[in-house]
């Protein structure tokens, strides 16, 4: 019984060390994700993130639950600590599992329905939380659906409050929002709601530490963006002016222009709805006019999300990206739903028509009208893949020219356009001023992280100021001012080398880091440049993370070993206590007891002491686990067996005069003559 109890303590201790973030009393233990198809066979131990997922209850009265999936790197680099990034996909009504499993999350899904590692996962730069919202999207559910952006804001702020109740250790983290497409409406509205909440806190509430917004190919200003379909299509070579449908497309474009001119009031009070069917028709006509009916069925239409690709008509990109064919069955597996701790095993769909049909965005002002007030407090980054039609970069540039923020309209005319260099290659170009940064990403689609995982992750470095600004040689052998970002950990190692080289007369000038998050009004172009470019060095930070992980494992092993030794020691003491024989000698007249030991036991104790001293602790532990008799060994007797001397049971007579001796050492006799030992022979 005692052994079982001690083993139970050992197992519980091991679990406590193996899962330090959870316990029976910790509510987030219910959301811990420990298994997924392929997690242990395809993902290395050091690449497996700490994961939590589930449907978090917001309102019990109407069964509103938001599904989230959180990823945390177990070997965080210093720059990534205390940072939480909430990712939202668009739609409206499209699941953020697109972002988790096809873009910025640590996993992609292969044809076998198993997770494989994404080398460009954003969770290496901060904790990633992918949320299905509004209710009804993906794995989220409710009896009621939201109808406008104000409702969505209220519910997401409620989700954040519940989320940080579940993860109080993250409540003070720097918070960033990232997403794409219709998240260009969601994210500014939610950010505005958070900033207003922070100014009107109730008793006991704490502010959310909102630091910045990152919107990729966002649907932000419907007026200007709808007017960009035709100019972009012509510039990209998608359609030519000699197309037979050109005149009808031009007329539709003019109708869209008339709507925009009529409703785009300067004060934002009389604005067009977020989605205009008249303007949407322009894009539909372009896709119809460029259809190639002689091509294979799956290549007849231009992909509206990446014009370099083709798709079937009238899908025109709805079947893209190809990973969707793997993600959908994966998320519909009952075992996966169990792994993700789902309460309601609803059938997952990428986009919910029910949510989209319930949503009436015409009751909400387009998010662009919230930009001026948001930019007064936090930075916004707009990044665009240059191959996207539906939310193209020309539309983004168009509404920025008309936007007034922080005392000025549009970017300054003399503002430099800087190259963005990642890992010694030009990845795009950047403009930044007065808290607003625009990044055009080369060779990328509507879903930038899908096409450029590692490059897209470095966008986090830009918004957090983790970059260098310097002159770099371009293809024309001309030096051009550039923003330079690096693979994970490289910049820190580079800075360390430069710091050490400062003592040398030949050291180069260290670049000045510029942070776009500073509300100083200074652009990225005001930073000091380097005299020469440094090539990227191997990631010392990666080696540091590896060494730290090894150190953590050794520490954990030592802690576990200490527990084992302590339990073993307790067991030894307990066994010794239970095996100690009771005294069979009465006390003397003075009340002192006589110490009794078998004579041969004394000899054996001496031998055992010598033997045990020669053994190591591991050998003695193994001997103990083998179950040796802790009571000692008695010398054999001749004749009939004597059994229980203490209980006086089963004792039989001897026919042999040879008996075992035991020694009686009297405390009284020792007091009388401490130099003499009296020995006395006693018959059993």
Curated annotation (Swiss-Prot):
Residues 510-538 have a biased composition (Polar residues). One of its GO terms (cellular component) is membrane. The chain crosses the membrane at residues 557-577. Its EC number is 3.4.16.6. This is Pheromone-processing carboxypeptidase KEX1. GO terms for biological process: apoptotic process; proteolysis. Protease with a carboxypeptidase B-like function involved in the C-terminal processing of the lysine and arginine residues from protein precursors. Promotes cell fusion and is involved in the programmed cell death. Pfam families: Peptidase_S10 (PF00450). The active site is at residues 181, 388, 446. Residues 578-684 are cytoplasmic.
